[in-house]
Every structure is written in structure tokens, then in C-alpha cells.
Amino acid sequence: MAKKGKKYQEAANKVDRTKHYSVEEAISLAKETSIANFDASVEVAFRLGIDTRKNDQQIRGAVVLPNGTGKSQRVLVFAKGDKITEAEEAGADYVGESEYVQKIQQGWFDFDVVVATPDMMGEVGKLGRVLGPKGLMPNPKTGTVTMDVKKAVEEIKAGKVEYRAEKAGIVHASIGKVSFSDEKLVENFKTLQDVLAKAKPSSAKGTYFKSVAVTTTMGPGVKIDTSSFKL
């Protein structure tokens, strides 16, 4: 493994690796130890006590963070007829039908989120092998396959984030930027944590929030004390 740089080591030395901090302390410390020379993202990782091999323990969804993520999302909408106008008026960056299928097949990816009306999924389905691995395939569970394209686009633009438990049961998500106030980051964190608590599968046994950490882009991780987390 490559040796971390001096700046990283100095930042990491400020974090007690044996300690689990309160949410407020952890977020403040993560911001303090950010070493990026840009407005870094603040990321969280929840390791959940679930078995993702079981169909009833898959966790996937989306949540609108009260203070957004600080990142502007470029939205592509696949729609027909009056839904095209609806999407455009809601602020979608790109709206169309099969012409965007062809563009994507040719290697175009100037977008961050894809929304589709159900009647367009036959066309969008052709892109499964391309969009799937990038996590861009529209999905009803995340509200990106819907006839209410206005709501979908507005929520994404307002700071909606998708979450999904990986094989090891870990959910990664961005909760904002280092430039955010501690209060706004804590509020975003608690909103996401509350959603994950409500998503706990009834068949999941043992400790649900196994470990949680917060970090910034390129910065050291800070462990969070989960003992006060409510389920």
C-alpha cells in the first residue's frame, strides 16, 4: 500500500483511532482534518448488520437531505409528450426519447442521475449493461422510474441522495461539503441515519448499526459512537 503523505499523517494524528466520537464531534473533527485544497465532500459509511445475499435484506432507496449535498446534479429524463415539458420546466438538464439512448451507446455520459417514465423503460432497458455498472439505471425504489417527473427532478435538484448497501452491508453517502456548517452536516447525517434505521429488515438479527465513520475527500476517517442511535 502506498505511504500516505505528510499532510495526511498530520491530520490523522489529530484523530484518536481508539475512540468513538459523538456525531457532532466526529463531523467537526472530519472538517478540521480535511487536507484537500478544494471544498471537499463529507462522506459517511454505515456498516449494517445485514446479509445482502438474502433478498429480504437488500437496502436501497433515496432521501432528500434537508440541506442538500452542495453538489449540483445533472439530470437526464427519458419521457414522451407532455412529460417532456414537465421535466424541462422542473429543471432537468436533458430531456428526450430514443435520441439519448443512441448518444449513451456512443459513450456520452454528461449527466449524474437518470429519470424515466415507465413507458420509456423499454428503451432505457437497452442501456442496462452500460448504466447498471455505473449505478445510473433508473429504479422505482429510488423514485427515478415515475410518471411524476416534476417531483423527481425537483427532489434531485434539492439534494436527494440515493443509498444502497454493498455486498459487505456498507452504505456510502455524501452528506455535504466541508464549507457547510456543523449544524447542517449533523442534520443531514441524522436524516440519513433515521432513514436507514427505518429500513432495517425485520429478518436482520443482532446489532444493526455495526460501525459508522465520517471522512472527507482524501482525509482520515473518524469513528462514530452508535450507542445512542435509535431504531
From Swiss-Prot:
PROSITE patterns: RIBOSOMAL_L1 (PS01199). InterPro entries: Ribosom_uL1_bac-type (IPR005878), Ribosomal_uL1 (IPR002143), Ribosomal_uL1-like (IPR023674), Ribosomal_uL1/biogenesis (IPR028364), Ribosomal_uL1_3-a/b-sand (IPR016095), Ribosomal_uL1_CS (IPR023673). The keyword Glycosyltransferase does not apply. GO terms for biological process: regulation of translation; translation. Pfam families: Ribosomal_L1. Disulfide bonds: none annotated. GO terms for molecular function: rRNA binding; structural constituent of ribosome; tRNA binding. It comes from the Bacteria. The keyword Aminoacyl-tRNA synthetase does not apply. Keywords: Repressor, Ribonucleoprotein, Ribosomal protein, RNA-binding, rRNA-binding, Translation regulation, tRNA-binding. GO terms for cellular component: large ribosomal subunit. Binds directly to 23S rRNA. The L1 stalk is quite mobile in the ribosome, and is involved in E site tRNA release. Part of the 50S ribosomal subunit. Belongs to the universal ribosomal protein uL1 family. This is Large ribosomal subunit protein uL1. It comes from Staphylococcus haemolyticus (strain JCSC1435).
